[in-house]
Structures are given as C-alpha cells and as structure tokens.
C-alpha cells in the first residue's frame, strides 16, 4: 500500500513534466488519449485556455501482477564522513552560540531601554512634583500677602473709624460745654 502511494506521488510529478513536454511538441492532442504508467491509467479529458484536465485511474493492489517491476526507492544519500559530521556539528554549535549571543544582546538592549524609560519617567515625575510644589508655594505666598494686605486695610479702616468716633465725641463734648 505504501509503495502504491509513493509510486502514485512519483508518477504525478512525472505526469506534469511529461504533459508539459508533450504539449510543446504536439499542440493538438489526440482525442481520448490514454496513457499507461505501471499501476496508473491517465486519460486526457479536455484542454482549455486555463490548462488541461486529466483523469487518473489507479489499479487496485489485487490487479497488480507480480511480474511488474517494483519501483525503486529514492536514491540513498551517500554516507557522510566523520570530518563532515564534525564540521556540521561545529557549524551548528557556532550557529547556536551566535543565536544565543544575539538573544542575550537583545535582552541587554531591552533592559537598557527599560532602565532609560524608568529613569525618564522618574525624572518627569520629579519635575512634575517640583513644579507642583513651586506652584503651590507661590499660591500660598500670594494668598498670605493678599490676606495680610486685607488685614492691614481692615486695621486702617478700624483706626480711621476710631479717630472719627473720637472726633465726634470731642465735638459733642464741646457743644455740651457751650450749651451747658
């Protein structure tokens, strides 16, 4: 079953390449052309401006004859040498160290940025507090001066009233002495 699936995948890759090559050489397809590929049968349905359409028919595993050759597995990779493996390991280790250094650098930059932001926020807070305190002190001084000026004005009026009352009393006493 697994070999059938892998064969199907390979044939689908080959089919698209084959179709491209055939369409280059034969611009007019043969009507009802059927292609046989091992355990697959491919029928060309129609050709459109947008592309071609095909019908792919897979034969069941029971229909496959034992005489049909098994499709070869993909070529094996060549054995890698110890030196090559060592180079790969060293390169991987170097990439890991570089990535780790980059992460540490980013963390350090982020911490430095956080410190700068915190320092700036504290500085702005201190400036705001100092300005608010200066403004409050100014208002208190102004209020104190206004209050003292108001009290001085009240004292002055009171003194003037007392002087006027004393003058009125004197005038009254003088009239009483003259009349009496």
From Swiss-Prot:
<feature type="coiled-coil region">
    <location>
        <begin position="75"/>
        <end position="179"/>
    </location>
</feature>
<comment type="similarity">
    <text>Belongs to the stathmin family.</text>
</comment>
<comment type="subunit">
    <text>Interacts with STAT3. Interacts with CLU (secreted form); this interaction may act as an important modulator during neuronal differentiation.</text>
</comment>
<dbReference type="GO" id="GO:0001835">
    <property type="term" value="P:blastocyst hatching"/>
</dbReference>
<feature type="region of interest" description="Disordered">
    <location>
        <begin position="59"/>
        <end position="82"/>
    </location>
</feature>
<feature type="modified residue" description="Phosphoserine">
    <location>
        <position position="68"/>
    </location>
</feature>
<feature type="modified residue" description="Phosphoserine">
    <location>
        <position position="60"/>
    </location>
</feature>
<dbReference type="GO" id="GO:0031110">
    <property type="term" value="P:regulation of microtubule polymerization or depolymerization"/>
</dbReference>
<feature type="modified residue" description="Phosphoserine">
    <location>
        <position position="72"/>
    </location>
</feature>
<feature type="modified residue" description="Phosphoserine">
    <location>
        <position position="65"/>
    </location>
</feature>
<dbReference type="GO" id="GO:0005737">
    <property type="term" value="C:cytoplasm"/>
</dbReference>
<comment type="function">
    <text>Exhibits microtubule-destabilizing activity, which is antagonized by STAT3.</text>
</comment>
<dbReference type="GO" id="GO:0005794">
    <property type="term" value="C:Golgi apparatus"/>
</dbReference>
<dbReference type="GO" id="GO:0051493">
    <property type="term" value="P:regulation of cytoskeleton organization"/>
</dbReference>
<keyword id="KW-0966">Cell projection</keyword>
<dbReference type="GO" id="GO:0010977">
    <property type="term" value="P:negative regulation of neuron projection development"/>
</dbReference>
<dbReference type="Pfam" id="PF00836">
    <property type="entry name" value="Stathmin"/>
</dbReference>
<dbReference type="GO" id="GO:0007399">
    <property type="term" value="P:nervous system development"/>
</dbReference>
<dbReference type="GO" id="GO:0019904">
    <property type="term" value="F:protein domain specific binding"/>
</dbReference>
<dbReference type="GO" id="GO:0007019">
    <property type="term" value="P:microtubule depolymerization"/>
</dbReference>
<feature type="domain" description="SLD">
    <location>
        <begin position="38"/>
        <end position="180"/>
    </location>
</feature>
<keyword id="KW-0597">Phosphoprotein</keyword>
<keyword id="KW-0333">Golgi apparatus</keyword>
<keyword id="KW-0449">Lipoprotein</keyword>
<dbReference type="GO" id="GO:0043005">
    <property type="term" value="C:neuron projection"/>
</dbReference>
<keyword id="KW-0175">Coiled coil</keyword>
<keyword id="KW-0963">Cytoplasm</keyword>
<dbReference type="GO" id="GO:0031122">
    <property type="term" value="P:cytoplasmic microtubule organization"/>
</dbReference>
<feature type="compositionally biased region" description="Low complexity">
    <location>
        <begin position="60"/>
        <end position="74"/>
    </location>
</feature>
<feature type="modified residue" description="Phosphoserine">
    <location>
        <position position="81"/>
    </location>
</feature>
<feature type="modified residue" description="Phosphoserine">
    <location>
        <position position="50"/>
    </location>
</feature>
<dbReference type="GO" id="GO:0030426">
    <property type="term" value="C:growth cone"/>
</dbReference>
<feature type="lipid moiety-binding region" description="S-palmitoyl cysteine">
    <location>
        <position position="24"/>
    </location>
</feature>
<protein>
    <recommendedName>
        <fullName>Stathmin-3</fullName>
    </recommendedName>
</protein>
<dbReference type="GO" id="GO:0015631">
    <property type="term" value="F:tubulin binding"/>
</dbReference>
<feature type="modified residue" description="Phosphoserine">
    <location>
        <position position="73"/>
    </location>
</feature>
<dbReference type="GO" id="GO:0005829">
    <property type="term" value="C:cytosol"/>
</dbReference>
<dbReference type="InterPro" id="IPR000956">
    <property type="entry name" value="Stathmin_fam"/>
</dbReference>
<keyword id="KW-0564">Palmitate</keyword>
<dbReference type="GO" id="GO:0031175">
    <property type="term" value="P:neuron projection development"/>
</dbReference>
<dbReference type="InterPro" id="IPR036002">
    <property type="entry name" value="Stathmin_sf"/>
</dbReference>
<dbReference type="GO" id="GO:0035021">
    <property type="term" value="P:negative regulation of Rac protein signal transduction"/>
</dbReference>
């Amino acid at each position: 079953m697994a070999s059938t699936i892998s064969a199907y995948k390979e044939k689908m890759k080959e089919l698209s390449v084959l179709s491209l090559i055939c369409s280059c050489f034969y611009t007019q397809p043969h009507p009802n052309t059927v292609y046989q590929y091992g355990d697959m049968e491919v029928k060309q349905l129609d050709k459109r401006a947008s592309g071609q359409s095909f019908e792919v028919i897979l034969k069941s595993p029971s229909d496959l004859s034992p005489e049909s050759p098994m499709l070869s597995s993909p070529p094996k990779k060549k054995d890698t040498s110890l030196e090559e493996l060592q180079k790969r390991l060293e390169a991987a280790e170097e990439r890991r160290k570089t990535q780790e250094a980059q992460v540490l650098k980013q963390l350090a930059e982020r911490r430095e940025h956080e410190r700068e932001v915190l320092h700036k926020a504290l500085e702005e807070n201190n400036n705001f507090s100092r300005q608010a305190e200066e403004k409050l002190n100014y208002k208190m001084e102004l209020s104190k001066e206004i209050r003292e000026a108001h009290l001085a004005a009240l004292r002055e009026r009171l003194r003037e009233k007392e002087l006027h009352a004393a003058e009125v009393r004197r005038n009254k006493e003088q009239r009483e002495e003259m009349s009496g």
